[in-house]
Swiss-Prot record:
Lineage: Bacteria, Pseudomonadati, Pseudomonadota, Gammaproteobacteria, Enterobacterales
Enzyme class: ligase
Superkingdom to which the source organism belongs: Bacteria
Catalytic reaction annotation: D-beta-lysine + L-lysyl-[protein] + ATP = N(6)-((3R)-3,6-diaminohexanoyl)-L-lysyl-[protein] + AMP + diphosphate + H(+)
Annotated ATP binding sites: R100, N101, E102, N109, E244, L245, G300
InterPro entries linked: Aa-tRNA-synt_II, aa-tRNA-synth_II, aa-tRNA-synth_II/BPL/LPL, EpmA, Lys-tRNA-synth_II_C
Xref: PANTHER family: ELONGATION FACTOR P--(R)-BETA-LYSINE LIGASE (PTHR42918:SF6), LYSYL-TRNA SYNTHETASE (PTHR42918)
Protein name (record): Elongation factor P--(R)-beta-lysine ligase
This protein's record includes keyword Zinc-finger: no
UniProt keyword annotations, A-Z: ATP-binding, Ligase, Nucleotide-binding
Function (record text): With EpmB is involved in the beta-lysylation step of the post-translational modification of translation elongation factor P (EF-P). Catalyzes the ATP-dependent activation of (R)-beta-lysine produced by EpmB, forming a lysyl-adenylate, from which the beta-lysyl moiety is then transferred to the epsilon-amino group of a conserved specific lysine residue in EF-P.
A single MF term (Gene Ontology): ATP binding
One GO term of the biological process aspect: lysyl-tRNA aminoacylation
Length: 325
């Protein structure tokens, strides 16, 4: 791609036209299936507690907030969408902006378009099939392969992630020349994520999308624990051509359990010297009121468009990435 002046869009206009057509196709996909499009706030008084997510924040100083009210840019519309589900919305989707104060590069931009949808009464596998349908339609690709998190580790690293001790994980990391990181890392899930990123991701989803499901229960986040194997969570991720595309759950509906997970996250944040994040009590109240059993998924639209167009970088499918914003 030739160099352009900084005032110009980084993506060719032809790519932006194709992007618009893909967004229309996505909306048609959900309209044909009777899924309601919704809009929720991009700022909130509460935010995620996940130790791996870093939200932007600002201060509202308008009427009623003379001392300033901290607001967080949403890393995902999940919490608000679950409140809609608890209010009786039925199946819903949203395609809008999310924000993460993290990295920027070929596959990352701090402001990005997220497609998120929720299906009441769907189990994880039925939602995986619907995600697969969408990918085949937009990317014109083959149906995805599926493998469990455990199978992925055994196949590519010859180690069982559900039973391996930290010493075994460090040995596996050493074979990948990661000892400089692994030898000082005490968190087991961080070690697993390191091994997954370096030792598994590059080998899956090369020719067709790959669904990896049943992540360890310790990485459940907002997912239910499997009733068949309490070592794993009803959670899946989708990879294609070296890119993580989506993250889905059979959603946790127990407000007490969710509150305990939020509190545990904040304890981990304190241990790492990270700021405590305000827990979203509106979400907990919605769960207490009663959210229907459902499954949900978040998918990166910019990355999807990049794959559909055969682009090498998000800058080829975004008008103004952060370095031109």
């Amino acid at each position: 791609m030739s160099e352009t002046a900084s005032w110009q869009p980084s993506a060719p206009i032809a790519n932006l036209l194709k992007r618009a057509a893909i967004l229309t196709e996505i909306r048609r996909f959900f309209a044909d299936r009777g899924v309601l499009e919704v809009e929720t706030p991009t700022m909130s008084q509460a935010t995620v507690t996940d130790i791996h997510l870093f939200p932007f924040q600002t201060r509202f100083v308008g009427p009623g907030a003379a001392d300033g009210l901290t607001l967080y840019m949403m890393t995902s519309p999940e919490y608000h969408m679950k409140r809609l589900l608890a209010a009786g919305s039925g199946p819903i989707y949203q395609m809008g902006r999310s924000f993460r104060n993290e990295e920027a590069g070929r596959h990352h931009n701090p402001e990005f378009t997220m497609l998120e949808w929720y299906r009441p009464h769907y189990d994880m596998y039925r939602l995986m099939n619907e995600v697969d349908d969408l990918l085949q339609q937009v990317l014109d690709c083959d149906s995805a392969e599926t493998l469990s998190y455990q199978q992925a580790f055994l196949r590519h690293l010859d180690i069982d992630p559900l039973s391996a001790e930290k010493a075994q994980l460090r040995e596996a990391a050493a074979k990948l020349d990661l000892s400089n990181i692994a030898d000082t890392e005490e968190d087991r899930d961080t070690l697993l994520q390191l091994l997954f990123t370096v030792g598994v991701e590059p080998h899956i989803g090369r020719d067709k999308p790959a669904f990896v499901y049943h992540f360890p229960a310790s990485q459940a986040s907002l997912a239910e624990i499997s009733t068949e194997d309490h070592r794993v969570a009803e959670r899946f991720e989708v990879y294609f051509k070296g890119i993580e595309l989506a993250n889905g759950f059979r959603e946790l509906t127990d407000s007490r359990e969710q509150g305990q997970r939020f509190a545990q996250d904040n304890r981990k944040r304190a241990e790492r010297g990270l700021p405590q994040h305000p827990i979203d009590n509106n979400l907990l109240d919605a769960l207490q009121h009663g959210m229907p059993e459902c499954s949900g998924v978040a998918l990166g639209v910019d990355r999807l468009v990049m794959l559909a167009l055969g682009a090498e970088s998000l800058s080829e499918v975004l008008a103004f990435p952060v370095d031109r914003a």
